[in-house]
Curated annotation (Swiss-Prot):
It comes from Neurospora crassa (strain ATCC 24698 / 74-OR23-1A / CBS 708.71 / DSM 1257 / FGSC 987). Zn(2+) binds at residues 84, 88, 164. Binding to mpp is required for catalytic activity. Inhibited by metal chelator ethylenediaminetetraacetic acid (EDTA). It catalyses: Release of N-terminal transit peptides from precursor proteins imported into the mitochondrion, typically with Arg in position P2. Residues 1-28 form a transit peptide. InterPro entries: Metalloenz_LuxS/M16, MPP/UQCRC_Complex, Pept_M16_N, Pept_M16_Zn_BS, Peptidase_M16_C. The active site is at residue 87. Binds 1 zinc ion per subunit. The keyword Transmembrane helix does not apply. Catalytic subunit of the essential mitochondrial processing protease (MPP), which cleaves the mitochondrial sequence off newly imported precursors proteins. Preferentially, cleaves after an arginine at position P2. Component of the ubiquinol-cytochrome c oxidoreductase, a multisubunit transmembrane complex that is part of the mitochondrial electron transport chain which drives oxidative phosphorylation. Its main location: mitochondrion. It is a peripheral membrane protein. It is found in: Mitochondrion matrix; Mitochondrion inner membrane. This is Mitochondrial-processing peptidase subunit beta.
Amino acid sequence: MASRRLALNLAQGVKARAGGVINPFRRGLATPHSGTGIKTQTTTLKNGLTVASQYSPYAQTSTVGMWIDAGSRAETDETNGTAHFLEHLAFKGTTKRTQQQLELEIENMGAHLNAYTSRENTVYFAKALNEDVPKCVDILQDILQNSKLEESAIERERDVILRESEEVEKQLEEVVFDHLHATAYQHQPLGRTILGPRENIRDITRTELVNYIKNNYTADRMVLVGAGGVPHEQLVEMADKYFSKLPATAPVSSASILSKKKPDFIGSDIRIRDDTIPTANIAIAVEGVSWSDDDYFTGLVTQAIVGNYDKALGNAPHQGSKLSGFVHKHDLATSFMSFSTSYSDTGLWGIYLVTDKLDRVDDLVHFSLREWTRLCSNVSEAEVERAKAQLKASILLSLDGTTAVAEDIGRQIVTTGRRMSPAEIERIIDAVSAKDVMDFANKKIWDQDIAISAVGSIEGLFDYARIRGDMSRNAF
């Protein structure tokens, strides 16, 4: 299933924090403490393939997977949807294993095999007992290098993906965020959807699938990741055995050149009015930060200050942020969610609003943007400390299990080339001050162009110029 959801939980792509010193007089049957010795190791093979892992000697299971620096952004308008289509075909048989043999082999191990596609990455991974890791790596290499891509399988999956596309169109949040990308990055690779338009899904050919593999599944764009009870040296040996014949690089193409060009953020809006939908669903964003930007963590802290709100929760009046308190007091929204979505060279920082108070849509948007402009000049240390505490807690909670750790390693190595140490992450977050937040807001929010995506009963949403004007209006 493609990973299309853009809403960022506070820990998207962030890292674990190492534990303290191990007490040599550990009580019997205690859960083994990780200590400070656990670290991420990396090795690069001769063909450029990176192997990265975090070994936990007490873990009974491991997650291994291949993170590929290619997603829908690496496609053209004509081939949009190819990466996701390939993900569906991955488990439909290889030159060595039929689909039934593949499924039976995974089932007999009690393992889990999965894949997903995003705008910038394609990922294939497996979770299994430590002793079955070599079998899983063998299966992964077989899928990546020997998939048959039979015409019969392509036609079957074509129908499956078309039905999936119909289901996605029923999910308002997905629709709003897809349109947000489309308007913010108009006529650029990052503005395309992951599934692709239906006409592409109907027309994608085997040749296009093969060409996508040839142009993107190369060693310089791939990272073999391991997390759990698999030693790094063992993973390197398996990588050398199974992936040493991968081509080092791909031929330069117009699609590859375009995909690496930093996209322009375009202030604009897209509105789809449908009064049969009982709510107004609105996303507003400014240009955010990339994964490697110096302001990445400041952006996350600023996002946490704006916060989230859900009227249905029992603690709705007390969800921490000033905006959530104001929205609840005046009954302006059903929910809202702040987000900071990052890519390799750009990002989207904003808020997603849902309300059934259709005569107060303008008030909701106005006071949300008033909160944004407040951040430019009036942020207290107390709310910054609360946001930092939330962020650090969310980081740890998001890294529960080997699959989450593998995801973090793979994403970081693919996008930035290194995995930041846990101590470094904590130090950076702790160093963020109220002044840093205000500096970030003045640079990224104050009087900046915005992208707006709105779906549903949106008659009450004012015109773009009026909303854009709120980006430079004093909060006082």
